[in-house]
Amino acid sequence: MTPGCARAAAIVAMQSQKTREILMSAAVSFPSYAARLCGSRTASDSARQSGQNSAMRVRVVLATILAFASLAGAQPLPGTKPLDFRGDPAAAMVEGIGRYLERIRPWYAARRNPDPNELRRLIGAIDRRVEPVVMELAGAVDQPPVLVSADSFEVLAVRWPVLEGVSGEGLYLRQFSGPRHLVIYLPETDREPEQCPEIFEFAAAGADVFVPLLLSSVHPPPPAPGGWAKQQSEREWVLRMAFPLGRHPIGLEVQQVLALVDWWKQKYPDRLVEIAGAGDGAWAAAFAAVLDPRIALVETGMLGIEPPSWRDQPLYRNIFGLSRFFGEQDIRALLRFRLGTAPRAMATPMRIPLRNAEARRLRFVRQIEEFLGRLARRSRRVRDELWANIRGSSPEEWRRAAAPLERRIREEMLGELPPETAAPEPRSRPLPPAPHFRGWEVMLQVRPEFFAWGVLLVPASLPEGRIPLVVVQHGLQGRPQDLFGQKPDSRAFAVYRNFAETLVREGWAVYLPQNLYTGDFRHLVRMAHPLGLTQYSFIREQYRVALDWLQTLPFIDAQRIGFYGLSYGGKTALRVPPFEPRFRAVVCAGDFNEWVGKLVSTEEPWSYMFTEEYDMLEWNLAHVASHAELAMLIAPRPFLVERGHRDGVGIDEWVLGEFARVRRFYDEMGIGNRTGIALFNGPHRVDGEEALRFLKKWLTEP
């Protein structure tokens, strides 16, 4: 120990035994830092210094040793306050995000600028309808076309073309002597058209009446080809398939209505169209009227599109961004003087026979499935055309060209939180020492209601200079602690294989964020989607705050930060690093896939169509950016996929096919050596062998 440090040690001797042990241990554990900061002054050098300067140097040395004592795990990290949080940080994080979402709802409401074209996009009513519309009788050849007759009208089962391969079906109450006007009635979605006696009141007042079949909120969808099933209604089934394609059950029903208006105006251009609805049918009725001024009168009552909380609403009412652009009063304002009550007259309800209802529903849902399936199959070409227009011939040109599309993905697909400044107030708490590393729990404030939480690990003997940092992200229901200190017989070890310890042994720092997808969290997605936000809106902001703080630490090299994420952490790899340039190399493990197929396939058992995980849904992803395109946004930075042959998230053929598009992109840019795929013979877990070489190459080698 140099003389300067010896004087510091003398002062240490006056401290308590525990403090003395901490400080001396720190001085011994980090000799290169201590020597550099104390200097190698001789006794004669020190004698030439004034007493004041000597005292100052001793104070500096003491502060340095105290800092290194904290790096030995004995106290909070330098520059942080002690962390005294008790309880489950993941649960507290989820609860805080929920409170934040409730707080910002009025912020969005105050900034609405209702636009019918925006509503059209939000519900996905954007496809060209079939022209001309030809009304057909529907039913078996051995059954009469007329279901029931009254004195002045008859009831027919009909169908009409709507979209490519999709027909609307329902009842047509046709006046014998010609109609005065048309009423389109959309009932609650737990009823068949034949179970709506109120329709006779419209017909008794002289109207022709259409009652379209709507997707059911009580009937299950038809069985999948392989027999896989999940307990859900037709409406939820279609929502899950339509949402990533930029479509929605309500939008498809609106298209049915507008096709009826098309037919009516072909036949009776001067006669009025009126629309009425109940329950979910009222949503479609009101939205159709907003989009089509040919509808002269709207009867819906209160829609309830601004419930006290979205978390308890059915999933099939999930319209991405609706509350951001429209409230109840905004819809009513757009309808203005068209709100009213459709004419009625006293009528005796008649029983309409319910013929072939199951076959009708099967036909209707299958047609929608086929329509959405075609959109999914064509979506790659749509993305190719979109991205072909911005590809550059060099990495620098690519980054400039990709900026507008990158912004579109952030704002329209993933969602961005409203700007707000909150001091991070870093707090830390040491973990029990381990042979190879020291660690701290870290808490950083992101917004007043919620925080970022993680674990920082550093080598027990911190090398001289700044060291690389690797952020390692856990998967669904995971915790940072799953990645280190686990016994070989534990489930966490089987999945994560103490990968954080492997990285620390390389002499690197490792940060392990706690992401929100733990415990009961999915209601946050239900609350966020109407505001045009997703879980990644929060995760990305938590990452921003964490990286801002991490790069201030004196031992972290901010130019050498890497990312490794498994499973849901692999999803994070494609939704945070593409928009965060401080990550210099990225590994996506156990998730990279032909993502559109993974989301919407009704024929593969690993599809999210058959799981509870509706948090996977991202609006219109299929036509904007799937996994290959998100990986392209990482370029020109290095990108690696890690994939086990027996990983149940998909099959090699899907993963390799999607990755081929990434490899081609890197090759065409002349940086093919910066990407690859690491295949191993194993299940859904960390492998790490090739990933470690990849990170070492791009974070440590010149």
Where are these regions (language model features)?
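Hydrophobic h-region of N-terminal signal peptides that target proteins for export
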Residues: 65-73
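Primarily recognizes the serine-hydrolase "nucleophile elbow" in alpha/beta-hydrolase
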Residues: 259-326, 330-336, 548-620
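Bacterial N-terminal signal peptides that target proteins for export
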Residues: 33, 49-62
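Residue-level detector of structural "landmarks"
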Residues: 1-10, 34
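Alpha/beta-hydrolase-fold catalytic nucleophile elbow
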Residues: 213, 299-302, 474, 514, ...
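Cap/lid segment of the alpha/beta-hydrolase catalytic domain
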Residues: 184-263, 304-314, 463-552, 597-606
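Short alpha-helix boundary/capping segments
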Residues: 7-26, 45-51, 64
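Alpha/beta-hydrolase-fold serine-hydrolase catalytic core, especially in secreted/extracellular enzymes
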Residues: 75-168, 175-178, 194, 237-253, ...
